[in-house]
């Protein structure tokens, strides 16, 4: 499905919305005042393929530290502000964007002060609605519901528009998958601004992957979403790995290998698991979009190979290498993986 048309904004040099690719975001978990530690985490995210990073601003020391962090960061930096609007005004001088939580940022006057500062610097604001920290007026009226989340978003969007500010990005996050999806779906036709997708407090890698694949993948397939973060209680790199997989498998990003492999059964007569692990490790650096197939027997291997750029069909102590369904080699099992990797390299070179 085509993406919903949205206004395009920029965070440093990264475009969000319109027809721009969907950037992947993450957040450091170091104390932001620890400049060295925070920059080390940003560097890890950069090499993992992250596009935008967010840093928490808990106090004045964090706010001051961001100046040096932004200057040295290879990624655009978003300041994550809760409770104290003064920090937002302070860091607006040097960060690339501001995220405010409408549930705790305070009065109209405080929001206007943030808007005025961002307007002067020409940096965007994310209205980051979270079902766990809604404004009292909306939670009392609607409970912690989709209606409350959407009402909060609309109120704050209208407020920023009243202040003549439209460099806006919106998120509506909940730890509940269905509530998250319904909130984004409900708001999407009402506003022209880009959406930042995410399931908040999604848990450890396994649970966060499942929740995010359902919610974010489902929304992307419906054409909703302009940037995203997969929130994981775990290693930073896992967030980027999962996010990129969701983008690829939802058809929103064509980058790297799409590896098709069978779940194995009693017909298996080779060490397919070992082969898959080697292939994944040896090809993780590849950016070229390729379909490759690694199958344990010939039952489905020939059919899958027709749709693959390069394929293996394992047999008993031997197997086939195929290019677009055509057999190019019959080899011993011990030779298959090396030849398969060589054929992948050759396929990439043929496209240069």
Swiss-Prot record:
Q: Where does this protein come from, organism-wise?
A: Campylobacter curvus (strain 525.92)
Query: Which cofactor does the UniProt annotation name?
Result: [4Fe-4S] cluster
Keywords (A to Z) from UniProt: 4Fe-4S, Iron, Iron-sulfur, Isoprene biosynthesis, Metal-binding, Oxidoreductase
Q: Which Gene3D superfamilies match?
A: Dihydropteroate synthase-like, Sulfite Reductase Hemoprotein, domain 1
Superkingdom classification of source: Bacteria
Pathway involvement?
Isoprenoid biosynthesis; isopentenyl diphosphate biosynthesis via DXP pathway; isopentenyl diphosphate from 1-deoxy-D-xylulose 5-phosphate: step 5/6
Checking HAMAP family in the record gives: IspG (MF_00159)
| MF term (GO), any | 4-hydroxy-3-methylbut-2-en-1-yl diphosphate synthase activity (ferredoxin)
Biological process, per Gene Ontology = isopentenyl diphosphate biosynthetic process, methylerythritol 4-phosphate pathway; terpenoid biosynthetic process
Q: Which NCBIfam families match?
A: ispG_gcpE, PRK00366.1
Q: Which InterPro entries match?
A: Dihydropteroate_synth-like_sf, IspG_bac, IspG_bac-typ, NO2/SO3_Rdtase_4Fe4S_sf
* Reactions the enzyme catalyzes: (2E)-4-hydroxy-3-methylbut-2-enyl diphosphate + oxidized [flavodoxin] + H2O + 2 H(+) = 2-C-methyl-D-erythritol 2,4-cyclic diphosphate + reduced [flavodoxin]
**Protein name stated in the entry:** 4-hydroxy-3-methylbut-2-en-1-yl diphosphate synthase (flavodoxin)
State the protein's purpose: Converts 2C-methyl-D-erythritol 2,4-cyclodiphosphate (ME-2,4cPP) into 1-hydroxy-2-methyl-2-(E)-butenyl 4-diphosphate.
Q: Which residues bind [4Fe-4S] cluster?
A: 262, 265, 297, 304
